[in-house]
């Protein structure tokens, strides 16, 4: 059965999305490994997975039956999360049900506006679009541009908001209170079950957790740091 927009929205409502990503040079930087991590997360109850890179998206699509949110990080500064339409098209072709893109108001490398990018994705693929935002103004602009989902992903990573220690629940609430009429997904620095629960209580449609579940190097460092007395 094809996953329609409404089915995906319903599948994510009040649920956990697990982000499975490893970075170049890390021991787990392997597409088969990421597929196994994603499958393990689904077995634990994840309603969807968020995956970076074409090879990983393809491997994860073959390993799980839940919605896959795909992205392509190109670089590590500025607009680098699925920064152009060509990146987005490749992510959709790899099998992503939802393409996550930089949803800020910053200039995009290919010169297209966010609205033009989203329109082309909708016209040329069956994928939905998640706009990773850094501020309320980003969210309002992304909603107007035609995004299917809004995320707090880039809160604290642009100049518009300070980087909070935990999730930016203030931004989450303001996005929801703005009545954008689009599902708002909480993402970014959600490190504990209680923080995920707080995000749902604040009105998030769904919650993305990555590092705290799928990045052993960072999780181990938290324990090591806490034990230093």
Give a label for each model feature:
Residues 2-3, 28-31, 49-69, 78-86, ...:
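Active-site-adjacent beta->alpha loops and helix N-cap segments on the catalytic face
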Residues 52, 184-190, 208-211:
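Glycine-rich beta-strand-to-loop/alpha-helix junction loops that act as flexible
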Residues 21-23, 43, 94-108, 149-162, ...:
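Glycine-rich phosphate-binding active-site loops on the catalytic face of alpha/beta enzymes
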Residues 44, 63, 94, 124, ...:
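Structural motif
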Residues 1-28:
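N-terminal amphipathic alpha-helix/helix-capping segment at the start of soluble metabolic enzymes
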Residues 41, 60, 91, 142, ...:
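Conserved, mostly hydrophobic/aromatic
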Residues 37-50, 93-95:
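Catalytic domains of carbohydrate-active enzymes, especially glycoside hydrolases
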Residues 13-18, 63-77, 117-134, 177-187:
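Short beta-strand/loop segments at the ligand-binding rim of alpha/beta enzyme cores
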């Amino acid at each position: 059965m094809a996953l329609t927009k409404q089915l995906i929205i319903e599948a994510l409502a009040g649920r956990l999305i697990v982000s499975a990503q490893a970075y170049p040079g890390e021991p787990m930087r392997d597409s088969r490994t990421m597929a196994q991590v994603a499958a393990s997360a689904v077995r634990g109850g994840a309603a969807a997975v968020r995956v970076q890179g074409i090879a990983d998206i393809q491997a994860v699509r073959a390993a799980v039956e839940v919605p896959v949110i795909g992205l392509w990080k190109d670089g590590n500064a500025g607009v680098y999360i699925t920064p152009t339409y060509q990146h987005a098209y490749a992510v959709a072709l790899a099998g992503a049900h939802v393409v996550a893109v930089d949803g800020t108001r910053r200039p995009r490398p290919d010169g297209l506006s966010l609205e033009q990018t989203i329109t082309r994705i909708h016209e040329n693929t069956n994928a939905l679009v998640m706009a990773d935002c850094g501020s309320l103004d980003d969210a309002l602009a992304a909603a107007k541009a035609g995004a299917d989902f809004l995320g707090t992903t880039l809160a604290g990573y642009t100049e518009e908001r300070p980087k909070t220690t935990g999730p930016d629940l203030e931004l989450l609430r303001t996005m929801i209170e703005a009545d954008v009429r689009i599902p708002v997904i909480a993402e970014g620095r959600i490190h504990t079950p209680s923080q995920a629960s707080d995000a749902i209580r604040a009105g998030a449609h769904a919650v993305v957790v990555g590092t705290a579940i799928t990045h052993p190097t960072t999780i181990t460092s938290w324990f090591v740091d806490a034990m230093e007395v």
